[in-house]
Every structure is written in structure tokens, then in C-alpha cells.
């Protein structure tokens, strides 16, 4: 009595089912990663990178020429993911401070993003950080409305830069997920 050989029809059927699950999971993680670039509670680029990692680990990472995904590509995208994730935390606060904002503007931008997303959807994601920074500068830093506009715009620019970097990174990783699906 022998175990299933690799050429046995049942083995091939199970193998094909696993392939479909792995590929679906990688694509799903890539999509969640892109969504996570805009939603502050989901770490977008790391989730996209895990999608690439899954293809690599299970050996499904081959492009249309039959070349496998290289370890080098995976490491490069791991480093890019780490850098983009760190920059996403540093850039908004840096631009807020460079524009004369206080720590309240940075916190207000994050609070505005969360509240804006919750109550106003996509428009809240865009306008929430700016409005949150503006209001927190007025209320907590006790600045005038005129003095609060520039830091609010700085917080908004920081949010856009961080989100843009994450979208580019996750979008490129999604591209590689599709390239390396065989």
C-alpha cells in the first residue's frame, strides 16, 4: 500500500486547491494592505508585504517567464516597508512642527482623521486631519484662527505625504503579487 504519488489525481486536486487558497490569500492581503494605507488602524504596507511573503514561502512566486521570486526582492521590499512605516510616523509630525504647529496639532490631525473617517467617510479622511489640527491648535495651544491655519495645512501635508508613500509601496507590492502568481 503506497501513499499518494505526486502524479495521483487526488494529490493533484488537493494541490490545486491549496494553490488557489494561497493565491487568493496573497491577493486578499494585498488589497487589505492598500485599504490600510488610508485607514489608520490597519498597517497597510506590512500586510501587503506578508502577501508577497506567502507567495514566496509556498513557492508560488514565479513570473510569466517561470522565474521564481528572489529572496533579494523580498528583502528589498521588507526594508522599503520598514522605512515607509517609520516615515509615516515621522513625516506628519515633522511637517506640522516645521509649519509652526504644536504637539496638539499632530494629535488633532490623527483625531480628526479617525473622527472624519467614522462620520464622513472618504471626505472625512481628507478634511478630518486638517480640521482636527486646526481646532486643537485653537483650543489647546490657544492660538488664533489665523495662527492655526498654517500648522493645520502642515499636518494635512504630512498626512498626504505619509499616505502617498504607503499607497505607492503597497501598490507596487500588489503589482509584484500579480506578477508572481503563476
What is each model feature region?
Residues 48-66, 111-117, 131-140:
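Interfacial segments of multi-pass membrane proteins
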Residues 1-21:
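Short, strongly hydrophobic alpha-helical membrane anchors
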Residues 141-182:
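C-terminal binding/interaction regions
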Residues 19-29, 99-111, 147-152:
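Short hydrophobic alpha-helical membrane-embedded segments
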Residues 92-98, 129-143:
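Juxtamembrane interface at the ends
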Amino acid at each position: 500500500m503506497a501513499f499518494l504519488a505526486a502524479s495521483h489525481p487526488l494529490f493533484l486536486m488537493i494541490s490545486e486547491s491549496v494553490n488557489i487558497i494561497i493565491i487568493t490569500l496573497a491577493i486578499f492581503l494585498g488589497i487589505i494592505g492598500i485599504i490600510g494605507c488610508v485607514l489608520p488602524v490597519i498597517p497597510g504596507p506590512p500586510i501587503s508585504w506578508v502577501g508577497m511573503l506567502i507567495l514566496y514561502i509556498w513557492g508560488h512566486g514565479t513570473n510569466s517567464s517561470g522565474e521564481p521570486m528572489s529572496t533579494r526582492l523580498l528583502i528589498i521590499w521588507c526594508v522599503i516597508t520598514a522605512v515607509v512605516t517609520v516615515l509615516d510616523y515621522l513625516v506628519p509630525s515633522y511637517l506640522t512642527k516645521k509649519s509652526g504647529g504644536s504637539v496638539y496639532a499632530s494629535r488633532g490631525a490623527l483625531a480628526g482623521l479617525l473622527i472624519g473617517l467614522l462620520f464622513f467617510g472618504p471626505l472625512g479622511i481628507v478634511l478630518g486631519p486638517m480640521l482636527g489640527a486646526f481646532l486643537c491648535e485653537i483650543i489647546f495651544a490657544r492660538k488664533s484662527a489665523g495662527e492655526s491655519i498654517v500648522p493645520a495645512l502642515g499636518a494635512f501635508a504630512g498626512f498626504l505625504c505619509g499616505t502617498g508613500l504607503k499607497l505607492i509601496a503597497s501598490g507596487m507590492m500588489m503589482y509584484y503579487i500579480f506578477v508572481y502568481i503563476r
